[in-house]
């Protein structure tokens, strides 16, 4: 929780030399958005086609071709992140977010985010900070701090494995619960 708060509290950097936004700022914002939007992947921010009534509906890029339900997900835009949502909305309405106009591919978009997160990681002393840290942290805090059932966390991550094996990979084990149970 402390590291997420540190990222939220980091001041923005001034505009880049070319008048664009520094990747530091983009990385900070996308980390916050991913964390607050159930670990939404950068490729899904890049490709998300629609938002209606403050709900983004998308098919998870990574797994849509492998699942019968096309890995469809609906994520609500919570009031705490509405300003970030609006900041990056595509004014043309072609897609939910404008990133597809700023970057040639979702891979380039992800590289920029991770470049900014590397810089942020050095500041907050989290070596190798990357975009997936937001997804993992969301899952860990949901299960270990908010007490959300692991099956629900698995759904939040848009996993379809009934054994919850993937959720267990994402969620850092909280030994304090075991120690307390052992007392």
Q: What does each of the following model-derived ranges do?
A:
Residues 1-42, 46:
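Basic, Lys/Arg- and aromatic-enriched nucleic-acid-binding interface segment
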Residues 32, 36, 40-43, 112, ...:
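C-terminal catalytic core of tyrosine-transesterase DNA break-rejoin enzymes
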Residues 4, 24-28, 110, 114, ...:
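Short, leucine-enriched amphipathic alpha-helices that occur as contiguous helical runs
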Residues 50-57, 127-128, 147-169:
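Short, polar N-cap/turn motifs at the start of nucleic acid-interacting alpha helices
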Residues 37, 46-86:
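Conserved tyrosine-mediated DNA breakage-rejoining catalytic core shared by Y-recombinases
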Residues 1-4, 78-126:
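Active-site/catalytic core of tyrosine-dependent DNA strand-transfer enzymes
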Residues 16-21, 61-74, 100-109, 126-130, ...:
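Short, contiguous acidic/charged loop-to-helix segments that flank catalytic cores in large enzymes
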Residues 60-65, 157-183:
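Catalytic-site neighborhood detector that most strongly recognizes the C-terminal catalytic loop/helix
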